[in-house]
UniProtKB/Swiss-Prot annotation:
<dbReference type="Pfam" id="PF02790">
    <property type="entry name" value="COX2_TM"/>
</dbReference>
<dbReference type="InterPro" id="IPR014222">
    <property type="entry name" value="Cyt_c_oxidase_su2"/>
</dbReference>
<keyword id="KW-0186">Copper</keyword>
<dbReference type="GO" id="GO:0005743">
    <property type="term" value="C:mitochondrial inner membrane"/>
</dbReference>
<feature type="transmembrane region" description="Helical; Name=II">
    <location>
        <begin position="60"/>
        <end position="87"/>
    </location>
</feature>
<dbReference type="InterPro" id="IPR011759">
    <property type="entry name" value="Cyt_c_oxidase_su2_TM_dom"/>
</dbReference>
<comment type="function">
    <text>Component of the cytochrome c oxidase, the last enzyme in the mitochondrial electron transport chain which drives oxidative phosphorylation. The respiratory chain contains 3 multisubunit complexes succinate dehydrogenase (complex II, CII), ubiquinol-cytochrome c oxidoreductase (cytochrome b-c1 complex, complex III, CIII) and cytochrome c oxidase (complex IV, CIV), that cooperate to transfer electrons derived from NADH and succinate to molecular oxygen, creating an electrochemical gradient over the inner membrane that drives transmembrane transport and the ATP synthase.</text>
</comment>
<feature type="binding site">
    <location>
        <position position="200"/>
    </location>
    <ligand>
        <name>Cu cation A2</name>
    </ligand>
</feature>
<keyword id="KW-0999">Mitochondrion inner membrane</keyword>
<comment type="subunit">
    <text>Component of the cytochrome c oxidase (complex IV, CIV), a multisubunit enzyme composed of 14 subunits. The complex is composed of a catalytic core of 3 subunits MT-CO1, MT-CO2 and MT-CO3, encoded in the mitochondrial DNA, and 11 supernumerary subunits COX4I, COX5A, COX5B, COX6A, COX6B, COX6C, COX7A, COX7B, COX7C, COX8 and NDUFA4, which are encoded in the nuclear genome.</text>
</comment>
<dbReference type="InterPro" id="IPR008972">
    <property type="entry name" value="Cupredoxin"/>
</dbReference>
<protein>
    <recommendedName>
        <fullName>Cytochrome c oxidase subunit 2</fullName>
        <ecNumber>7.1.1.9</ecNumber>
    </recommendedName>
</protein>
<dbReference type="InterPro" id="IPR001505">
    <property type="entry name" value="Copper_CuA"/>
</dbReference>
<keyword id="KW-0249">Electron transport</keyword>
<dbReference type="InterPro" id="IPR036257">
    <property type="entry name" value="Cyt_c_oxidase_su2_TM_sf"/>
</dbReference>
<keyword id="KW-1278">Translocase</keyword>
<keyword id="KW-0679">Respiratory chain</keyword>
Amino acid sequence: MAHPVQLGLQDATSPVMEELITFHDYALMTISLISFLVLYALFSTLTTKLTNTNITDAQEMETTWTILPAVILILIALPSLRILYLTDEINNPSFTIKSIGHQWYWTYEYTDYGGLIFNSYMLPPLFLNPGDLRLLEVDNRVVLPIEAPVRMMITSQDVLHSWTIPTLGLKTDAVPGRLNQTTFTATRPGVYYGQCSEICGANHSFMPIVAELIPLKIFEMGPVFTL
């Protein structure tokens, strides 16, 4: 989960998030190197006399600064496309859970367990216990298994929402009249937090998402809910 004054990304809890963090570091390193070279060239131009205003043609240089950026963009695009494919790939999920966005709460439906449905509202500050997180705790957590592919089917009953849990690398829009889906495989148990990531009205900031990830063997005994 996130920490105060945190500058980096949250720790990964799924293979896709691990890929995203690796790609982020790779792209950031590439961009930093390019920025350093450009700033160095500008600084050298301003502080030295290594310039020639009489040059009217430099085809080799123009060819180089056309091809080189194209190669760099391709090297960045290829791993990006690979991750994009991984995020959309859905193969034989073990469990399916439906999430419905409302103004301003979430409804969860366990389709594999007799259509069990419950709502998840943010806990107001008056009901928080010591150690709870303000604006992030809910009355009913969505309980999910680890080490098993889970498919989330996401839609909305009113306006646009977005179901997001950063540590799992999940962000899927909830669109009225449309059923979007995403999949993930969590790698470790814990309680992980997210929020609606699409501006959806006056109380947009007050519809958090809390996922409690438990071992698969415990989940298969019957989902454990904090109802």
